[in-house]
Amino acid sequence: MLTNPTIETLKTLKLYGMLEALEEQQQTPAIQALTFEERFAALIDRERLHRDNQRRTRLLRGAHLKVAAASIEDINYKAARGLDKRQIAQLATGEWIRRTQNLLITGATGSGKTWIACALAQQTCRQGASVLYWRVPRLIEELRIAHGDGSYLKFLKTLSKAALIVLDDWALTALSNQDRADLLEILDDRVNTGSTLIASQLPVDKWHAYLGEPTLADAILDRIVHHSHRIELKIPGESMRRVRASADP
């Protein structure tokens, strides 16, 4: 039986996975057939699994995904919206994140952009990488506030640390020159250091006109369009929001 000092020591060291596994071993007579090394290896494996699960939970909570339940396993390929299953499978490996490449998802309202973006972001968290989700209108507002209260540089640093940033609702609202400059700062910080996933109703070839100021537009697009993967979604006849709502119990 585990003694109270042993239990307290494991708790003090925050070895909760090991403690749980050790208690299970104490309640399993057949475990005595294993060698000490085998039992100890099982404890270490459980502790590592426990920590991995905790990290994934923290990453998912910190990502603030709009659709937290979205997962690549539940992506609907039956709807005729231009999804390539092989492309999604490749993106799901996370190799594009490791190579600090970008992903641009475009399509009309209801085509499932946000859901797919969140599914890939969730997959990134499950693989142990950090994610931040932002709707661009809200991000712009937060940047304006940060300029006013002196937290701008700290905010930029926080954004730069994420392995993946999801910028949803790109090109939805008008931008000021300061907004454009802020977006350039964010994207420039991520060159060769992090990936950016952009979801937008507006086709990529119209982004330059949307951004407006030619010099800043060139600089912004240079940092996101090159070395990027693209998914262009089509409306399958019915909004994917309605399709999912009707499928819910």
Stretches with model-predicted labels:
Residues 5-8, 24-28, 74, 102, ...:
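Short hinge/gating elements
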Residues 83-161, 211:
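Conserved P-loop
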Residues 164:
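Walker B motif beta-strand of ABC-family P-loop ATPases
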Residues 7-9, 61-84:
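Dynamic helix-loop-helix/coil hinge segments at AAA+ ATPase domain boundaries and subdomain interfaces
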Residues 1-20:
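Charged, compositionally biased N-terminal leader segments and the immediate start
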Residues 16-68:
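Interdomain "pre-motor" coupling segment immediately N-terminal to P-loop NTPase/helicase cores
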